[in-house]
Each structure stands twice: as C-alpha cells, then as structure tokens.
C-alpha cells in the first residue's frame, strides 16, 4: 500500500487489531535467513487483523510480499550507552521511509538520545524530511505523549509504559495512560502488555484509534510460559 492519509488509515484500523509480528536474535522464532515472520503475518491476516507492526528492513520486505495490510514499521538497533533503541536515529527513519510503508514508529521518550537531540527537534527534522509520512510515537508517560502529539506526530503509542525506569510499572497494559491520552483528544494506538481479550475490549471502549497486540499472539514461548506459570502460583 504505502502512503495513505491519516483519516483513511484510522478508518481502516478502527474496531480491529493490529498484530505485531517480531522475533529478535536469541528468540525461538528468529532465523538468520528469515522466512518466519511472513507465516505469522499470514495467520494474523486470516484471523482478521487490520494491520501489522514489524521490525527490520528484511522482515518488512518479506511481509510486504504476503500482505497488503497497513504496516507500522520499526527498526530495533542498540546505541549504548543510551537506552532508546526503537527507530532511535535518522538512519533508521531513512531506512524505513525507503520501504514505502504506512507508518513509521519511533522512540519519543524523554530519555537521552544517541544523536543528542531534544525529541521535539528530532520530530521536526523527520516531519520536514518526510512530510507525507505518518509517524507513531512510542512513549511511556502522558507528558511524553502530549509533547510528541503537539510536535506533529500522528499517533501516540503507549508501547513503552513500564519499560522506562520512571513510568508506571504494571504486569498488564497501562489502561489509565490510554484513557488519559484519549480524553486529551489524542489519536492513541494502545500497545504494550495487552495479554488477554477482555483487556482489548476495555481499551477499545476508551475510544482509541487502534490497538496493537504482539507477544500474546505471536510469541509462542511467552504464551507457553503464561500457561505454565499459572500452575505454579
């Protein structure tokens, strides 16, 4: 698909589930030669997914061969000692922009960045360089979400709540954060620690623009661990 208007994308993803299909080195479904993520995407599509979130140029290229669903793309690349690793610099934005995908997601937390830029300055740079591209901010707090939205980011994702040292630490999704962002009139894509269908229904009814579910669907090891640990509580 590629470039799409914000309103058209909102219409396409509303009332549905975007499924995150990712596997990193060291995880059971990761293979150096690839080929696994397209199979997960085909399963997600057959189930009725309205979009896909995917990581890396290789995976996204393979996924585009098997689906026309809108893609939220990221590149996870470490830049130690700085913590942000989700589309953390212009290098990753450039690589994703070349793939002609619907949405590019990036870390928009307040943490120190590898490029040394303030997050608003970085947002201004990417918006200027790619004015027709839709962007999603991965944030961990209300303040981060508000800052990114006011700077021109199209969608605010609650992806990193619980994954920064200063954000709310919960086993499940940060429903309070989702609700607060929605009440502020922000286009929210809820994501992060959504493990059960009843959580999806609660989040949907808050008025989100979209919902991303990942590990609870596409990480078999994580799913198995949840069942096994239930026997030992």
Swiss-Prot record:
Changing residue 11 to Q: In strain: DAT2. Transmembrane segments: none annotated. It is an enzyme of class 5 (isomerase). Changing residue 205 to N: In strain: 10581. Changing residue 19 to V: In strain: DAT2. It holds the Pfam family NanE. Its EC number is 5.1.3.9. It catalyses: an N-acyl-D-glucosamine 6-phosphate = an N-acyl-D-mannosamine 6-phosphate. It comes from the Bacteria. One of its GO terms (molecular function) is N-acylglucosamine-6-phosphate 2-epimerase activity. Converts N-acetylmannosamine-6-phosphate (ManNAc-6-P) to N-acetylglucosamine-6-phosphate (GlcNAc-6-P). This is Putative N-acetylmannosamine-6-phosphate 2-epimerase. It comes from Streptococcus suis. The gene is nanE.
């Amino acid at each position: 698909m590629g470039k799409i208007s914000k309103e058209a994308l909102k219409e396409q993803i509303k009332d549905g589930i975007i499924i995150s299909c990712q596997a990193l080195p060291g995880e059971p479904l990761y293979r150096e030669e690839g080929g696994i993520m397209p199979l997960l995407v085909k399963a997600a599509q057959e189930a009725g997914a309205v979009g896909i979130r995917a990581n890396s140029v290789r995976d996204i290229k393979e996924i585009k061969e098997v689906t026309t669903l809108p893609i939220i793309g990221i590149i996870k690349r470490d830049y130690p000692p700085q913590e942000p690793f989700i589309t953390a610099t212009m290098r990753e934005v450039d690589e994703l922009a070349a793939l002609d995908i619907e949405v590019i997601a990036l870390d928009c937390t307040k943490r120190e960045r590898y490029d040394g830029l303030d997050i608003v300055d970085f947002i201004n740079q990417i918006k200027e360089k790619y004015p027709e591209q839709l962007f999603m901010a991965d944030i961990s707090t209300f303040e981060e979400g508000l800052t990114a939205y006011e700077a021109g980011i199209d969608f605010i994702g609650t992806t990193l709540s619980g994954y920064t040292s200063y954000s709310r630490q919960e086993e499940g999704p940060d429903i309070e954060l989702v609700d607060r962002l929605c009440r502020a009139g922000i286009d929210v894509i809820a994501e992060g620690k959504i493990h059960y269908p009843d959580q999806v229904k609660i989040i949907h009814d808050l008025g989100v623009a979209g919902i991303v579910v990942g590990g609870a669907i596409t990480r078999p090891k994580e799913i198995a661990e949840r069942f096994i640990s239930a026997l030992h509580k």
